[in-house]
Design a protein with these regions (language model features):
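Extended, Lys/Arg-enriched charged tracts that mediate electrostatic binding to polyanionic substrates
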Residues: 105-122, 127-128
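Solvent-exposed alpha-helices and their adjacent loops that cap or buttress functional pockets
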Residues: 2, 121-126, 199-201, 231
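Active-site gating loop/helix substructures
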Residues: 18, 89-92, 97, 125-225
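Non-catalytic peripheral regions of patatin-like phospholipases
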Residues: 60-107, 147-150, 198-361
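Structural recognition of the beta-strand scaffold that forms the well-ordered cores
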Residues: 9-11, 41-44, 131-133, 207, ...
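Patatin-like phospholipase
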Residues: 3-11, 16-107, 146-147
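Flexible loop/turn segments at secondary-structure boundaries
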Residues: 17-20, 49-52, 139-141, 215-217, ...
């Protein structure tokens, strides 16, 4: 596909502050190649939603140009992430404001007060479309916040809602057991079905979980698996940036393990379907945190001489594994860890460009 014809969708996974930084590295590559201007749709989950929300907050509620991102926004975001322990701030808000109830709502308050994420979806630029993905406890479906839609098909949609960005982001990051649900009072809003007809909400309260429970990639607003795969109308090339941790060996019995196993299997199935779709159509990249260049070459069944050619240019196997093992947390990282994770996100898209050159000049 020619570069000038690209309508890029970004599906950005969850994974706490690690995911936020990894995705910033992906955006850095796009900016260096003047491709941010061709991003038409961003779909985000959990830590990725925090990343995108911070990006808008630090750029006057507009999506940055490639030049703005490189010269101003990325350095500003780095400083913010390094200097603010968001996890600590959220705990303080949970103790003093919510008495340890509604911890997801405490995250929203911390995002607003300490990261400066304020305003609602009507305040951000119309392009690209930004979909913040959550999971509805009541319906079991993916619940979406964006500039043009709030809701899910099973519960209904909010009409003319300028939903606060910080609250949508916090709902997207409300992991079960650890944080709990984000609660929405449905009564103040006017609800409608898909056709726009007015309906009454099915309950007075709606509870939203981390979008990763349903789809940790945030793929569904951009890519659907029906009919051998299809993109939404506003996208013809999708970059799936997966900064989630793979499931690992665990002998200790915990109730959260069933969530880990279920979400891991869902992610594997979604990844297989997406990879098959983009390989057939040459219209996307799948980036996986923790994979070094030689592993990408090997999995693609390419000549390993390609890996040897660049072995001194990219992060080592050990460095990539360090990124993969970085904990899922909202604590501020060290500058060394920030730079390492950022570089892995940046290099991951270069790996794919070298192995699968789907974008023509």
């Amino acid at each position: 596909m020619k570069k000038s014809e690209l309508k890029i969708g970004l599906a950005l996974s969850g994974g706490g502050i690690r995911a936020a930084i990894y995705h910033l590295g992906v955006l850095k590559y796009l900016a260096e190649n003047n491709l941010l201007e061709q991003v038409t749709h961003i779909s985000s989950v959990s830590g990725a939603s925090m990343c995108v929300g911070l990006l808008y907050a630090k750029n006057n509620m507009s999506f940055p140009t490639s030049n703005e991102y490189l010269t101003t926004i990325l350095p500003t975001l780095k400083e913010q992430i390094l200097n603010v322990n968001l996890e600590q701030k959220a705990i303080i808000e949970a103790i003093f404001k919510f008495k340890f109830n509604k911890k997801a709502n405490a995250i929203a308050l911390a995002l607003s007060k300490h990261w400066g994420i304020r305003g609602g979806f009507c305040d951000i630029s119309k392009k690209p479309l930004w979909s913040v993905v959550c999971t509805s406890y009541e319906t079991g479906k993916h619940f979406r916040f964006s500039q043009d839609i709030v809701g899910d098909w099973a519960f209904g949609y909010i009409k003319d809602s300028n939903f606060p960005l910080a609250d949508a982001i916090a709902a997207s990051a409300a992991f079960p057991f650890l944080i709990g649900t984000y609660e929405i009072d449905t009564k103040p809003f006017e609800w409608c079905d898909k056709s726009g007809a007015k309906i009454e909400p099915k309950s007075d309260k709606l509870h939203l979980w981390d979008g990763g429970v349903y789809d940790n990639f945030g793929l569904e607003p951009i890519y659907q698996m029906e009919n051998n795969g299809m993109y939404s109308d506003d996208v013809n090339f999708c970059i799936l940036s997966n900064a989630g941790k793979s499931i690992s060996f665990q002998s200790k019995k915990t109730i959260t393990r069933i969530v880990d196993v279920t979400t891991d299997q869902i992610s594997i199935l979604r990844a297989r379907a997406f990879r098959d779709f983009i390989f057939r159509n040459k219209n996307g990249y799948y980036l996986k945190m923790g994979r070094d260049f030689s592993e990408v070459v090997r999995r693609a069944k390419q000549d390993m001489s390609l890996a040897d050619k660049y072995k001194n240019d990219f992060l080592s196997v050990e460095e990539c594994q360090k990124v993969a093992n970085y904990p899922t947390t909202l604590k501020n990282p060290t500058e060394q860890d920030f730079d390492l994770i950022l570089r892995q996100g940046y290099e991951s898209i270069i790996y794919n460009k070298l192995v699968f050159d789907f974008i023509e000049p």
